Amino acid sequence: MKRREAVCAHRHFLGTGKPPHPLGRSIPVEPCPGLPAFAEVDLLSLLVPIKISSTPPSGSRLDPQIASSAFPGLGSLGGQDSSGSLVQRASCELESPYEL
């Protein structure tokens, strides 16, 4: 119920006033219909600590392909380095409350 209210409040906030900036809305929600509308903000906040704290391993050539297939908007957001692998993002998501 709380998630539903948050999504409604998020859409109501976006619906009033000026249209959102194109850079902030570059991640599409359509490929993941199960995610709430405010999940893209969480993704943006997770990309920043991943890019700063973790250096991509030597086998990271496959990561941009995996990330681009799951989230097509991430490639245009900051290139291959900022997308990172889905495994790194999942592990960082679990540790982020403690690191912050």
UniProtKB/Swiss-Prot annotation:
Predominant localisation class: cytoplasm
Location(s), subcellular: Cytoplasm
Source superkingdom: Eukaryota
Annotated segments matching region Disordered: 73-100
GO CC aspect terms: cytoplasm
Keyword field: Cytoplasm, Developmental protein
Tissue: Expressed in the testis but not in any other non-reproductive tissues (at protein level). Mainly located in spermatogenic cells in seminiferous tubules of adult testis.
Protein name per the record: Testis development-related protein 1
